[in-house]
Amino acid sequence: MAAFSEMGVMAEIAQAVEEMDWLLPTDIQAESIPLILGGGDVLMAAETGSGKTGAFSIPVIQIVYETLKDQQEGKKGKTSVKTGSTVLNKWQMNPYDRGSSFAIGSDGLCCQSREIKEWHGCRSTRGVNKGKYYYEVSCHDQGLCRVGWSTLQASLDLGTDKFGFGFGGTGKKSHNKQFDNYGEEFTMHDTIGCYIDIDNGTVKYSKNGKDLGLAFQIPAHLKNQAVFASCVLKNAELKFNFGEEDFKFPPKDGFVALSKAPDGHVVKSQNTGSAQVSQAKNLPNAPKALIIEPSRELAEQTLNNVKQFKKYVDSPKLRELLIIGGVAAKEQLTLLENGVDIVVGTPGRIDDLISTGKLNLSQVRFLVLDEADGLLSQGYSDFINRIHGQIPQVTSDGKRLQVIVCSATLHSFDVKKLSEKIMHFPTWVDLKGEDSVPETVHHVVVPVNPKKDKQWERLGKNHIRTDGVHDKDNTRPGGNSAEMWSEAIKVLKGEYTVRAIKEHKMDQAIIFCRTKLDCDNMEQYFIQQGGGPDKKGHQFSCVCLHSDRKPQERKHNLERFKKCEVRFLICTDVAARGIDIHGVPYVINVTLPDEKQNYVHRIGRVGRAERMGLAISLVAAEKEKVWYHVCSSRGKGCHNTRLKEDGGCTIWYNETQLLSEIEEHLTCTISQVEPDIKVPLDEFDGKVVYGQRRATGGGLYKGHVDILAPTVQELAALEKEAQTSFLHLGYLSNQLFRTF
């Protein structure tokens, strides 16, 4: 308790921490907690299980509590932040809501971007939330552009998310990254009219006065939101006319100029050039902290930690809420309406509640992105930037928004890029460094070569069910097609997985598969072996963990594995990310991950005190054709086995190349074993040692000692000689050097 109190942690939280048997803070906690309590933005990296969740949860709980306490007692901070700007008093393009290479003329209407590789966009200073409106855009050159409408939630890259509607010079309309043919192309000297009927939920365009017809039906979740005139440019110049000047092609059918919109229908932009300041009034659905996790399991895990840490925090009590998909939203909405202080959730459901106005971001003091590299790899970059843009940068009591980013590694380019965009002079706390394999882990590769191992030809139908990629191909033995070898690899990997379990008499292991379908097929194969979820204690008892399983089933399966009720957890990278499962003796990589960092995440989970962990990777010697869904359904009901470049949903997966990249990343050569998967064992100090990495480095103490032994002996002799000489000096017969 004293150790945490010395860092400034309040006594109530320190008491709860002590009950969890946390006598001393971990390294990441000792570094990060004081920084966050001090009000700074923090980027932290540490291994899973290092206390990273506590490192951000403890200070977040404390500051949220102190904020609520101050409000309860009527205390107010000194706000020196100026808000508002004269730029909002007229219709023009907003210099505070634009891309970095987007230029606006002194009149606020002439716009230009000369960036030839990237799109840069902008929105107007004002928007409208009711009525029928029109504005014109004149093209001054032959560059590329899209014009239209968007909400403040939208990306400045107009038409690439569900909050914006664009029409481009190539004759395409765009919404939510869906580009469809519409109208006709336009270029220099053309004038585009942009129409919106908010009451009836329609958007349309005209070219030089010619009506191009209906372009979009506005979705229900956007009908009550203010929309702003928007554009995005690539090496182009435009000029806007909101109605202060005469239109070249005046609108008909009741549409009026934006500049003539009544005051009751006009909404000023929140992007004013100075920091947004949150409302002083407390709203029940406006939390003080928002913690975003990449998976439901991790969100539940973090929420449980928050509950433990705040156990003794009272008067006022903190209210936390879990917001995740896959469960009924009704209960979550009820709790939101009753009031909430800390929200922990996953991006999908949080995005839904924000877009429908159910979750208010006006009071957020903390934005925490846990496992940020996982969030970015799942494609949530736009979501993160969007919600960060909606959160006021300064609270009503004058405190700045704090952003905390946690990641398994801070050396990812995407994480660095994100931090530069949304964080304010962050402090880096990197206790992980570059990826390396723990010395308690022995990892080996088993080559899967169907040209050498002909077992797959003799199995008939008694093999694992494959993913269906080759259902329409001729994969019968006797040919020499790439498809035949690919199917053979899938079959052999099922056999090698079973062989590895039997050979090493595995009592517990995590088995990583590439896709959810692969996980299901492996589980079914274990059932064929007599195991499965219902066979407790069987050699092949197993449970499955991936996002297609119901949340309750996932939670139950994870608990069963942790309690050793089943031997094997079959899962995907996404499902397993960040989950606190450690000390597992074995990991099997049925397929190598396509991101080399994930390889270290996977194998780092193995190892016990009594023995080293063993990670076995099955690596195909030939290319394997696998699913890579780019379709809107993300694989549900998809049977398009054509390659991605041909409009399909498959790719050729090159594990040999991936292995080379992993070895280069780790600067070591991974040992290879034969298909019988017999891994050489060495005896040392009564413990089983599965082997050593070929790279030189830590752990090779014996050789190091042998090298130093002669020098140590020489030092010992010199020390003895020096001490003997000193003693003799004190007792010389003539007593010239008498000691005192």
Curated annotation (Swiss-Prot):
GO CC aspect terms: cytoplasm; cytosol; mitochondrion; nucleus; tRNA-splicing ligase complex
GO BP terms: double-strand break repair; mRNA processing; tRNA splicing, via endonucleolytic cleavage and ligation
What's the source species' lineage?
A: Eukaryota, Metazoa, Chordata, Craniata, Vertebrata
SUPFAM superfamilies recorded: Concanavalin A-like lectins/glucanases (SSF49899), P-loop containing nucleoside triphosphate hydrolases (SSF52540)
- State the compartments where it is located: Nucleus; Cytoplasm; Cytoplasmic granule; Cytoplasm, Cytosol
Q: What family does the entry list?
A: Belongs to the DEAD box helicase family. DDX1 subfamily.
The UniProt record lists the Helicase ATP-binding domain at: 2-428
Quote the protein name from its UniProt record. Answer: ATP-dependent RNA helicase DDX1
